[in-house]
Design a protein with these regions (language model features):
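N-terminal beta1-alpha1 ligand-phosphate binding loop
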Residues: 2-28
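Residues at the starts of beta-strands that form the adenosine-phosphate
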Residues: 3-5, 36, 59, 128
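Electropositive phosphate-/nucleotide-binding environments in soluble metabolic enzymes
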Residues: 15, 19, 84-88, 147, ...
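Short, glycine/charged-enriched secondary-structure capping and boundary segments
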Residues: 21-23, 76-78, 119-122, 145
Length: 183
């Protein structure tokens, strides 16, 4: 039974890059019975209907950093615990146990592209937002001029898997990431 669904909403330019770590996520988790990963190419003018439907039913969350000016429901996930960042905006924390949100979107793009994707996708702005607080800085070395404190897509997924108890899946991804990052 699928316990977690990850949608890698990927910018078209990212699909062509040899340094894209979203493909590693798909490769590492493709055999998992608990986790499903789908790559969806982001379209500015035509949102994916499944994501729209899940968003409208409030069953879709967005893994994206906190923004100081947000008024939406936002959680910080640290050491396996959800912490409300805007308690007035929601009623229940999305835990693996209560199953309230098992569908999560990750923006697979550069930070500049991801910010643009979020701005131009109203349905994503209305999603519950999950911010991860990693214990360590990024180890990703294949791109220059990275935003301080930012993680690549594979690192975000590893952190999410760690924090939500999918340790074996996280370790499989970590092995692939370590090899990929040595190039």
């Amino acid at each position: 039974m699928t316990e977690l669904v990850l949608y890698l909403l990927t910018h078209s330019r990212e699909l062509q890059k040899s340094t894209n770590t979203g493909a590693l996520v798909v490769q590492a988790l493709s055999a998992s019975l608990k986790i499903k990963v789908e790559v969806i190419e982001w379209q500015r003018k035509a949102a994916d209907q499944r994501l729209l439907d899940l968003s409208e039913r409030q069953q879709l969350g967005l893994v994206y950093p906190l923004q100081a000016d947000t008024a939406q429901a936002c959680y910080l996930l640290q050491q396996g615990q959800y912490q409300a960042q805007n308690p007035a905006a929601f009623t229940e924390l999305p835990t693996r146990q209560n199953g309230s949100i098992k569908h999560w979107v990750l923006l697979d793009a550069t930070w500049q592209e991801a910010a643009k994707m979020l701005r131009q996708s109203p349905y994503l702005q209305s999603c519950y937002r999950l911010a991860l607080k990693p214990d360590a800085p990024s180890l990703y070395k294949l791109r220059r001029n990275q935003k301080a404190g930012a993680l690549c897509t594979a690192e975000v997924v590893m952190e999410l898997l760690q924090q939500t108890g999918f340790i074996n899946e996280k370790e499989q991804l970590m092995l692939l990431f370590d090899e990929f990052n040595k190039r």
